[in-house]
Amino acid sequence: VKPSELLPYDLLIPSRESRKGEIDKWFEGTGRAPVIRGRIAHMMNAYELSLHGVGISIYPASISSLIRDKDVCVREVAHPDAHASYALIWNKKHTLSHVAEEFIAYVKEESGQQVYYA
């Protein structure tokens, strides 16, 4: 789904301000602002609201693994900026468990990203 195709609809988006800013950027090229009907903290609440016709929810794709209802449609947003960025944060002075060290190594390897230390 292209962001411009969402303009006629009421949208339900995550409550975090950073997510609203990201979603607003998807619509910059359209010359129009989306109609944000609600900002919902929990994606399952947004799912229920969408199920009952309140609006279209914009949430991480991971919610699709939780949905078993045939009355709900899940589509990917087709925009280069339609992705979430995350950071791993840990205390440098704290000794991490073996599992934590392995997880960090895995993330570094899979992402190809450099780890930055503050």
Map each language-model feature to its residues.
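Short coil/turn segments
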Residues: V1, D10-K20, S62-S64, H79-P80, ...
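Secondary-structure junction motif
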Residues: Y9-T30, L96-A100, I104, Q114-A118
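Short beta-strand-to-loop elements that line the ligand-binding cleft
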Residues: I13, R32-N45
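Active-site-adjacent beta-strand anchor residues
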Residues: I13-R16, R39, S57, I89
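C-terminal alpha-helix
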Residues: Y106-E110
